[in-house]
Amino acid sequence: MHIVVVIPTYNEAENLPKLVPALFALPLNLDILVVDDNSPDGTGQIADDLAATYPKRVRVMHRTGKLGLSSAYLQAFRSLFENTVDAIGQMDADFSHDPSALVEMVKRIDTCDLVLGSRYVPGGSTDIYWPIWRKALSAWGNFYARSILRMPLRDVTGGFRLWRRETLQAMPLERVKASGYIFTVEMAYLAWCLGFKIGEVPIYFADRRWGKSKMSFKIQVEAAVRVWQVMWAYRDLQHKKSLAR
């Protein structure tokens, strides 16, 4: 199985040179597509250097500015549709997502259309050093989203995922309007509404080792509001799903 892992970057100069070799150390037929939003810390140049070190295995997509997580993924997905890739991965560049978990996710993708790296299934967890309030906020945000959208999934807000290429290609991506972190919720909801089979694999979600987190309380509040917009945007698909039961 040929896999391409998409890694959006913005100021990940400390993390990217460590993550790429870690991914290539896995027993997988894996390539990497870095999507850099003109990082001022030189991440784009580092990505180019990695592409030179690993020719044909690392590709870099340079964008003109900080255009956002959702547009980075959507642009990358579309660029891979004409490729021979079998599966497309999503992961953060900051080691919040343990690269080794991809091995189990690849095993599951044989029988699923989408595999989620899940913090909230048995065996999954969040950083042991997080304070209680942060663990509670993360769990509440996830519970809130999946409850409002009535999805029978345990982790809909996480960003560690593996898609079958055919699944992404069959989805109406032109309808995806979310920006920022709510993008992960919208994509899971759209896949679920369309009836795709979604599996979950337990992961340990670690705090970033290097660099500064881009998550903030403001972003989380905005995401809570936008969950309702996601539900409204796909009410036609939800209606069809209800009729099909």
Regions found by a protein language model. Give the residues of each.
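Short beta-strand/loop segment that forms part of the nucleotide-sugar
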Residues: 30-39, 61-62, 91
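Hydrophobic helical membrane-anchoring modules
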Residues: 1-3, 143, 150-151, 173-245
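A conserved acidic beta->alpha catalytic loop
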Residues: 36-45, 65, 95
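Short glycine/serine/threonine-enriched helix-capping/active-site loop
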Residues: 90, 116-118, 201-203
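Acceptor/aglycone-binding surface of glycosyltransferases and processive sugar-polymer synthases
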Residues: 61-82, 87, 99-181, 208-218, ...
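Short, acidic, metal-binding catalytic loop of nucleotide-sugar glycosyltransferases
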Residues: 21-30
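Acidic helix N-cap motif at the loop->helix transition within catalytic regions
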Residues: 14-18, 41-50
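Active-site beta-to-alpha loop of glycosyltransferases that engages the nucleotide-sugar donor
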Residues: 7-20, 38
